[in-house]
Amino acid sequence: MAIESKTVSFGYEEVEESEKTGKVGAVFSSVASKYDVMNDAMSAGTHRLWKDRFVRRVKPRAGETILDMAGGTGDIAFRMVDSGAHITVADINAEMLAEGVDRALDKDETRLVWSQQNAETLNFPDAHFDAYTIVFGIRNVTHIDKALAEAHRVLKYGGRFFCMEFSQTRWPGFDKIYQTYSHHILPKVGKAVANDEASYRYLAESIAKFPPMEDFRAMIQAAGFSQTKVEPMMGGLVAIHSGWEV
């Protein structure tokens, strides 16, 4: 009997389950050195404000342990490190981590720990961290449910889960404007600034394929988190999701 292969979405393309991690890896290896340019292009520069707001919601505290997953370039970790929290920056992509380490060296920042990790199979003990953060990363995971289950596993009782991700805006008319921008203009921006139209097209498509806010909230609850919340920004173009391991 032939074994039926499973497919998953890679943007608008359906690919074999076993292929997605490698394809996503190739995208982020390509954009690693231009990561800030990519985020500026996707958010018109507002990602910096969103990330500041995200960190205010996390409220990192001195002495606690935080896992910043898919945090390779250190964008979120650098915002949290002065709190005195012990932060591990994890990413599946070596090039993204290398970019973060280089930035840390430029800043003379030695307080962060860097670790190459797959969000679906974390190499950390149970109940290890006080908080888990992931920003603009979970939509690129092959099995989102497995990544959420791992986040729940590595959090201590009373631990906090925070995720910021693109979604679909509910502002009348703005959704069409953003769809036009992300699907037709953004790839051309990618070609102009990074000579990489395909990666930017995937990133736009991956946003469109990500579950709506309330559906993703239900996935977080299904992973075992309690007191889940969704905080939409720009009408839901971006949302901060949170939950507790209790």
Where are the regions a protein language model picked out?
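N-terminal auxiliary segments of SAM/dcSAM-dependent transferases
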Residues: 1-26
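Hydrophobic beta-strand segment of the Class I
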Residues: 35, 132-133
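Class I SAM-dependent methyltransferase SAM/SAH-binding core
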Residues: 65-121
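A short acidic, Gly/Pro-enriched loop at the edge of an enzyme's catalytic core
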Residues: 120-132
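Core SAM-dependent methyltransferase catalytic element
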Residues: 223-246
